[in-house]
Design a protein with these regions (language model features):
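Bacterial N-terminal signal peptides that target proteins for export
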Residues: 1-12
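Cleavable N-terminal signal peptides
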Residues: 13-14, 24
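Ser/Thr/Pro/Gly-rich, low-complexity intrinsically disordered stalk/linker tracts of secreted
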Residues: 25-210
Length: 210
């Protein structure tokens, strides 16, 4: 059990290095952290977190690759999958860092999420929603479950989690601009639909930030 936990930490370090190498000419070094909600227990829900530096460029797209061994269920739309906490720097509020809280829900696709998926260039098999609130505003960010491509499957990944974020660094009034001109700094969510392996082993998570 401890071996599996150590490899998760190692995978996060490798992901951070990969993300940095891919953006060597920009200020951008995001980090991915994956943990268990049950400590070293096997088979429980999964907690996923991302962190981006306050001085880093804004994130547009995040793809998280789920390794073989983890099971991704198909919850019924309307199911509460877990809690979400996040922080974002709001340009319209002088750069104030806003704490956001909410929940991760399984939802049925709708016109808004379908447009978001098309903009991301993906065909999701499931649609989840990061339902957040801060400063009297509600923010819904689609999180898509996407089947991996054949080369990704060959590398040992069973699913992809994809989030495409609205731009914060465009003029006020631009269609699709993020609320408050908010730039994501961190987000952590728990999903009961992503269960950990039932056997100890080496499980490497990988991510791509752009």
């Amino acid at each position: 059990m401890q071996k599996a936990h150590r490899m998760l930490v190692g995978a996060c370090a490798a992901v951070a290095t990969l993300a940095f190498a891919g953006t060597a000419f920009a200020s951008y070094a995001p980090k991915l952290v994956v943990s268990s909600t049950g400590g070293t227990a096997l088979g429980g829900a999964t907690r996923i977190g991302v962190v981006v530096g306050a001085a880093d460029d804004a994130t547009a797209n995040t793809t998280i690759y789920v390794p073989n061994g983890y099971a991704v269920g198909t919850p019924t739309p309307g199911t509460d999958l877990g809690k979400v906490t996040a922080t974002a720097a709001a340009a319209d509020l002088g750069g104030a860092v806003l704490p956001l809280t909410g929940e991760l829900d399984a939802i049925a696709p709708n016109a808004t999420t379908q447009a978001a998926a098309q903009s991301c260039g993906i065909t999701p098999t499931q649609t989840w929603d990061l339902h957040l609130s801060a400063a009297g505003q509600t923010l819904d960010i689609p999180l898509f479950v996407v089947a991996p491509l054949a080369p990704e499957t060959a590398l040992g990944f069973t699913q992809k989690l994809v989030v495409c974020l609205p731009p914060p660094d465009v003029p006020v009034g631009t269609p699709g601009r993020s609320v408050f001109g908010a730039k994501l700094l961190s987000a952590t969510f728990t999903s009961s639909a992503i269960t950990q392996p039932t056997a100890a082993g080496d499980y490497r998570w990988t991510s791509l930030f752009t």
